[in-house]
Structure formats: structure tokens, C-alpha cells
Amino acid sequence: MKICIISNLYPPSERGGAELVAQRVADELSSRGHDVFIITTMPFAGIKSLCPKVTEHYVERVYRFFPLNLYHLFNAHRFPHFLRLIWHVIDLFGPFPKSVIKRVLKDEEPDVVFTHNLKGLGMSSAFQIQKMGIRHIHTIHDVQLSVPSGILVCDQHKNREQISLVRRLYEKATKYAIGSPDVVISPSNFLAEFYQSRNFFPNSEIRVIPNPTPKYVSREERGTVSPSGPIKYLFVGQIEDHKGIGVLLKAVNNLSFPFELHIAGDGTSVQSVVKKAKLDSRIIFHGFISLEHIRKLMRNCDCVVLPSMCYENSPTVIYESFQVGTAVIASKIGGIPELVIDGENGLLVEPGNISELSEALSKFEKEREVFWNKSKEIQKSAERFSLKKYVDELEKIVASIK
């Protein structure tokens, strides 16, 4: 079967978990004998970058092109809001990306197209796929079809954001652009219900399938003896205010026992973290690191902390943490409570509540040995999120579409 995967970003140009999911699925499908190719974006690099070309040819072929807009998605934070507004309009209605994708699809003639995040690649590309009559499966990863930034902090969707005229107009445009794929996959019940409540995908079948863990599973044990020394907390992800990094740094200031806070990632708030790490030896900043390095940190740290302030879908870092047997302290928001069970594989706290997060960090320190003893149990629980099972489901879904 020839399969096309379309994603606004694709490794090594990744910003979040959606791109990693797309790559893992591509690799697994290829290993099963399917002919897989990718369509994704690249920053502007002269006139030639407007034409799609295969820039990598590993197991899968990767077509990259610049989707003719004011700037590339990666550079959005550098531009003022009025230019971002124009950028969003072009992304929604610009004909160029749609024509490029149409040309590639006509040349390749895939049996099915899997789409992931499309913002920055041309949102109406989805409508083009459906117009061509190709089987179409779309995976939603965040709220970007409802909120341009893809970020909805705490209770925004219950108050002023709910009645925003701009947001309503934006939703109307994205509903038209995304259309109704044959099947829409949501990694969490939260996100599926979020979009259904806002009348997206009226003619699509909605399926909830949690994200897959990486195919590689380390055989290295976390340890069978009781941990000693300062407790080690780990934050992995985008270093942004909406990810709760500021809340976490304030929360650890309230701790009265020895600890280490390891931070790995990159983002617009990285300089404040670097400054904090220079002033406090208990805070260790690793920067943007490889997945293998992340796994090593997860194995060696006592727990992963995910203090997000925004409505998360189904964070990849939780799956990866469970896969190595490490518990998670996380915000009780979005789809996180569907993965983290309070007291079993981690602890849940109210988002943005500094004192509650401090209490959870302290509680974990007291129950440190208890959670280490649960490592194998936590690791085993991650087996239901295996990449093999995930792709098995995808193949069944494709076969069911007439």
C-alpha cells in the first residue's frame, strides 16, 4: 500500500510530540512493507524552495517545500501580531500549498493520506485531499483548529475566549478548510469531545487512540535498590510560560529538603532558565537533547514533572516516561488525567497552583521509594501504547474505509 503522511513539521525539524508521532508511524509502516512518503515544510531558501523536492530518502521519502507565506512556522515568535494575522489568513486561504500538494499526490497516487498538524503548511490542503477522493485519516494533536496559537490556557475556553468574535470567525474558516476526513483520530477523549462540542468534523468517524510510544524499549533497569542522595526531578519539553516552567521554578523554591531539578528543552523562556541555573546549583539545564539522552535522564531521575498551564492533549513525554518506568507529577488539565492516575503512576495537581505543586513535590520525596518500587508496574502499563498496536489499528481503519 502506498501511504502519504502530511505534517507541517517533520524531524529533524520538530517542535513537539506531533512530529515525532508522525515519524514513528512512518517508520513502522515502512518496516511492514508499505511505500511511505512524507510531505512537509522547510524555511525559505530561495525560489527553488517553493518547489517540492525529496530532501531525504531514508526508509521513507521526504518532500519539503516552503509554503509561500510571510515566514516559516518556526519563526512566528519573531513577528508582530498584525503580521501573524495576515500569515494566518494566507495559511487558511492561500492557493499555493494546496496546488503543490495536489501535484505531489497526483504524481505519487497514494492509497491513503494521513494528515497531522497542518497549520503553516496550508490548512485547506485537507479539503484538497477529500476533493481528490483519496482516503483521508486526520490526527488531531491540539486545539489549533479552534485557537490560532494552538494554546488554550486553563479556563480560557469557558470565558472570554468562548465568545470571541475573532475566534468564531477563525473556527468557521478552519471547519471549511479541514472538512470532514473519513476518520479523525484523537489521542484523548478530552480533545475528541472538545472538537465535537464545537461542531467540527460533522461527517467523520471519530476514534480515540492514545499516541504510540517509541519502538525502542530500553532493557536497562532503573535500579533495584532504594534511591539515595538528593531527589531528582526532571522537566522535559518546550521552555515556555504556558508549559508551567515558571510555576515549577517558584514551586521548588518552597522545598526544604535537598533536590536536583533537571531541565531539558528549548523555547522563548530559555534564557531565564539559564540565568536561574547559574545562580542555583540545584538546577541543572541540559538544553535541547536527543531522545536517547532524555531516556537516560528519565531512568536516572525519580520523576518527571509536567506542570502545564495549557490544555494538553496527550503529552508524548508522559508515554516516554512510563516506558522507562518513571512516575509523573502533572497538571490536572486536558487529556493528562487519562494517562496519569493519581497515586498509582504519579500525582496530579491543579494547573498554576504553586503551593499545591510544592506539596506534590514534597509528597513524592516522602514516597520516593514507593514509586521506585512501582517502576516495573509503570513500565508494563505502557505496553498498551505500543507502536505495533497503534499501527495495527491504523491498518484496520484504512481497510474499513470504502
Question: Can you describe what each PLM-predicted range is?
Answer:
Residues L20, I231, F235-N254, T268-Q271, ...:
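A conserved mid-protein helix/loop that constitutes part of the nucleotide-sugar donor-binding site
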Residues F190, P212:
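Carbohydrate-associated surface elements
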Residues V273-E292:
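Nucleotide-activated donor-binding/catalytic signature segment of Leloir-type glycosyltransferases, i.e.
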